[in-house]
């Protein structure tokens, strides 16, 4: 999988740029604040439909401009695709091969990317919502070729049913049939979501083991789903109908208390991913260095699972990895990426710390949003 060409117009501080990328390492250098991360953000937007900085479309426009436009030409499984993303205040539009797409997440079907930024550490240190988002994205991208209903569709329908039940909880009177209808739908979708998450984590674990070893960690990191159904037995993970029945019963039993609190407390929207290093909670007992390598290993395991699913490696997009890893960590990371043979994008103002031996990088230098190919790394980026 490869991004061959990218055109940007009025994106962040970039007025206009057209870039052709190499099949291996593409190294983006330049002073801080001049557009290195903006370029990676554009690539991530074309691959995932969302900003890795969690910015709305209005914030991505160049100052004073009404809209921005990204266009990427990709090769995936020997097929070419043309991806476009238009954004303006309160509105965005996506086209794939000239046809409008109903959801930005559809971009991932033509361009898969694994993105590593300093914020990746949030997988370990932040609350359950960040980890749920991670496993849901992996379940969507790694399950989309199996013919089953997309995890993204299931998750979207679940959120609609959840909002509907939460509205019922605030009403003074509700007919029994209405409770039954929404709770049955919520339980069925919730069981499907929980099972999808459980299955993708089962597939992710062996890849995580290998990536940790490649990154030089002797400890074992386990990632498990903490689900409310666990206390009622583990059989739910293998039996979707049993999980749905359990959810229906729990929703009915907790209806009175949830009416008092005003929100649904039962369901996969309350799940978490438990990360343990040699049996100990990583967030509480892991060192900063261990947490950083563990978070990186999770993203690399995601990439390997994608490769297993798609038959080719996704793009690797790394924003200033040298700021998060020591010399040994960088050497191991770049060696691992070189062995993968996929297309890599690295932005760094510490170019001298990137061990690119064997990767033959294509180098870009950016100055105030203007990009140029360069044979040498300018001294101010060293």
From Swiss-Prot:
Keywords: ATP-binding, Cytoplasm, DNA damage, DNA repair, DNA replication, DNA-binding, Nucleotide-binding, SOS response. GO terms for cellular component: cytoplasm. ATP binds at residues 30-37. The keyword DNA repair applies. GO terms for molecular function: ATP binding; single-stranded DNA binding. It is found in: Cytoplasm. It holds the Pfam family SMC_N. Transmembrane segments: none annotated. Its main location: cytoplasm. SUPFAM superfamilies: P-loop containing nucleoside triphosphate hydrolases. GO terms for biological process: DNA replication; DNA synthesis involved in DNA repair; double-strand break repair; SOS response. Belongs to the RecF family. The RecF protein is involved in DNA metabolism; it is required for DNA replication and normal SOS inducibility. RecF binds preferentially to single-stranded, linear DNA. It also seems to bind ATP. PANTHER family: DNA REPLICATION AND REPAIR PROTEIN RECF (PTHR32182:SF0). This is DNA replication and repair protein RecF.
């Amino acid at each position: 999988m490869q991004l061959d060409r990218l055109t940007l117009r009025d994106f962040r501080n970039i007025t206009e740029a057209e870039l052709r990328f190499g099949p291996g390492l593409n190294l983006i250098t330049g002073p801080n604040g001049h557009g290195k991360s903006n370029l990676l953000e554009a690539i991530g937007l074309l691959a995932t439909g969302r900003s890795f900085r969690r910015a709305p479309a209005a914030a991505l426009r160049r100052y004073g401009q009404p809209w921005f436009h990204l266009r990427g030409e990709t090769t995936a499984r020997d097929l070419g695709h043309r991806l476009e993303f238009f954004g303006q205040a309160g509105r965005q539009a996506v086209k794939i091969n000239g046809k409008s797409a109903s959801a930005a997440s559809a971009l991932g079907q033509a361009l898969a990317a694994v993105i590593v930024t300093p914020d990746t550490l949030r997988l370990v240190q932040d609350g359950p919502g960040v980890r749920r988002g991670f496993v849901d994205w992996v379940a969507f991208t790694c399950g989309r070729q199996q013919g089953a209903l997309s995890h993204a569709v299931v998750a979207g329908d679940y959120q609609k049913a959840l909002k509907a039940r939460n509205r019922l909880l605030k009403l003074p009177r509700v007919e029994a049939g209405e409770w039954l209808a929404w709770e049955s739908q919520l339980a069925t979708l919730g069981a499907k979501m929980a099972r999808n998450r459980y299955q993708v984590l089962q597939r992710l674990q062996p890849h995580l083991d290998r990536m940790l070893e490649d990154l030089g960690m002797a400890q074992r990191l386990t990632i498990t789903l903490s689900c409310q159904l666990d206390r009622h037995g583990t059989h739910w993970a293998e039996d979707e109908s049993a999980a749905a029945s359990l959810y229906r019963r729990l929703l009915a039993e907790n209806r009175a208390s949830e009416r008092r609190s005003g929100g649904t407390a039962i369901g996969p929207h309350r799940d978490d991913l438990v990360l343990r290093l040699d049996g100990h909670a990583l967030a509480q007992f892991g060192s900063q260095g261990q947490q950083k390598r563990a978070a990186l290993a999770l993203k690399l395991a995601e990439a390997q699972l994608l490769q297993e699913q798609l038959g080719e490696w996704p793009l690797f997009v790394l924003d200033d990895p040298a700021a998060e890893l020591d010399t040994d960590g960088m050497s191991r990371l770049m060696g691992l990426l070189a062995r993968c043979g996929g297309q890599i994008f690295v932005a760094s103002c510490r170019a001298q710390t990137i061990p690119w031996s064997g990767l033959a990088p294509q180098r870009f230098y950016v100055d105030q949003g203007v990009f140029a190919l360069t044979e040498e790394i300018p001294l101010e980026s060293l």
